């Protein structure tokens, strides 16, 4: 669907028996929120926006200055296919602003949109694609999630070892109904672990797609009596789940990642910027204490390095051709806020271009092998969430690109997460209640 005016939206609502309209947004951690507006009140909501209490949303506002307004992006309208066909449910993604129309520093969609505009001013077009991994778990007799995966399958397995085939099919078909373009789906390495890759799009559209994808997966899992988890490391002895982010740059219709990448080219400088700032970005790409259990094994990187093909590297250049040429950042996980994560990756690449950073030579070693990595003098990603917060708080780069209010609130909330886990009598139970059941 593609609509540009309020009247277009109202006509669609009337023609398609829509009774509820979700005004969707996310908190600073990327947890989706929404307010459902009845169709009879939609005209007013489109005209005036929808007011809400920002002090009740993680990382938004203090109670003494809590009023905020949701402004829908009309281009994002979509029907939710898993909801009833009688009295249908429609959804917008929204930007968040202050009641007087002033910008709100916690509007993560706005941050990503502004970052993309900076590339457009340079004559550059950014495309972003994602590869999202997740686990499917059984529920107990009371409908509560268990830690029992739905199968014993491994990488690329098929039925009967793969019990998720039909769910992935339903997920992909629902994605297509909602205007997304799934490309590949398969069983991943872990028992009950799955991956679905989505075709690249513009940065903002891709971030919206990540939010929608997680909605779809959870809804279809729930419909089948299962629990879908996007926790980075839900099972200690199984592979972690990543959200690999693929990026390409175009100028005058040419993919700058196609062919050999000169160290001082635009693509080379972009990669150099991402690598240079990767430690500072980690608190945003890997926002949970659990995120750091994933690094250094099962194809999740630990060292700041790049290579062609090598999956032990932080940045990989796949051996492909044409529009598929890209760089792949392998550290992010699906618990991240995709608007902040993608926006900051673009900001790091842009800083590399602005500073004319030169890409260092590739490292063609297996960095999952400690003996191989030893002596190379490579920087490592932060080992804990506390370290990631400290690195980010000391970052001059982040002070330059992030609104001060947003970064302060984000770091404060992250430190609260760390303190809550440290003080929990049973850390495993704390992680299950606050993360496994919710992420």
Describe the function of each predicted region.
Residues 1-439:
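Glycine-rich, acidic/polar active-site loops that bind/position phosphate-bearing ligands
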């Amino acid at each position: 669907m593609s609509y540009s005016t309020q009247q277009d939206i109202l006509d669609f609502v009337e023609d398609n028996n829509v009774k509820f309209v979700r005004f969707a947004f996310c908190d600073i951690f990327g947890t989706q929120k929404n307010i459902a507006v009845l169709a009879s009140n939609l005209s007013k909501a489109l005209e005036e926006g929808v007011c809400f209490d920002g002090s009740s949303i993680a990382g938004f506002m203090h109670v003494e200055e809590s009023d905020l307004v949701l402004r829908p992006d009309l281009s994002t309208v979509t029907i939710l296919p898993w909801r009833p066909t009688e009295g249908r449910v429609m959804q917008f993604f929204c930007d968040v602003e202050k009641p007087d129309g002033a910008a709100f520093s916690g509007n993560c969609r706005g941050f990503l949109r502004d970052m993309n505009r900076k590339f457009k001013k340079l004559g550059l077009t950014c495309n972003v694609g994602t590869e999202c991994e997740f686990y499917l778990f059984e529920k107990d007799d009371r409908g509560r999630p268990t830690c029992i995966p739905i199968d014993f399958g491994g990488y690329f397995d098929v039925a009967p070892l793969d019990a998720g085939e039909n769910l992935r099919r339903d997920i992909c078909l629902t994605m297509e109904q909602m205007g997304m373009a799934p490309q590949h789906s398969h069983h991943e390495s872990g028992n009950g672990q799955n991956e679905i890759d989505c075709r690249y799009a513009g940065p903002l559209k891709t971030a919206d797609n990540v939010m929608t994808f997680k909605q779809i997966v959870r809804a279809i899992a729930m419909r089948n009596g299962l629990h879908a988890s996007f926790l980075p490391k839900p099972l200690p002895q199984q592979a972690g789940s990543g959200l690999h982010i693929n990026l390409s740059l175009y100028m005058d219709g040419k993919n700058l990642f196609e062919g050999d990448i000169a160290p001082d080219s635009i693509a080379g400088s972009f990669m150099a910027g991402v690598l240079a700032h990767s430690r500072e970005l980690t608190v945003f790409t890997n926002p949970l204490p659990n995120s750091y259990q994933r690094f250094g094994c099962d194809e999740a990187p630990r060292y700041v390095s790049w290579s062609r093909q090598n999956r032990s590297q932080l940045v990989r250049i796949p051996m492909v051709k044409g529009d598929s040429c890209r760089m792949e950042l392998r550290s992010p996980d699906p618990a991240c806020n995709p608007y902040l994560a993608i926006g900051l990756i673009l900001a790091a690449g842009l800083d590399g271009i602005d500073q004319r950073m030169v890409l260092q030579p590739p490292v063609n070693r297996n960095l999952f092998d400690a003996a191989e990595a030893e002596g190379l003098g490579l920087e490592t990603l932060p080992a804990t969430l506390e370290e990631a917060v400290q690195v980010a708080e000391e970052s001059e780069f982040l002070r330059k690109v992030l609104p001060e209010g947003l970064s302060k609130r984000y770091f404060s909330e992250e430190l609260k997460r760390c303190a809550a886990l440290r003080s929990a009598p049973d850390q495993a139970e704390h992680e299950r209640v606050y993360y496994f059941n919710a992420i």
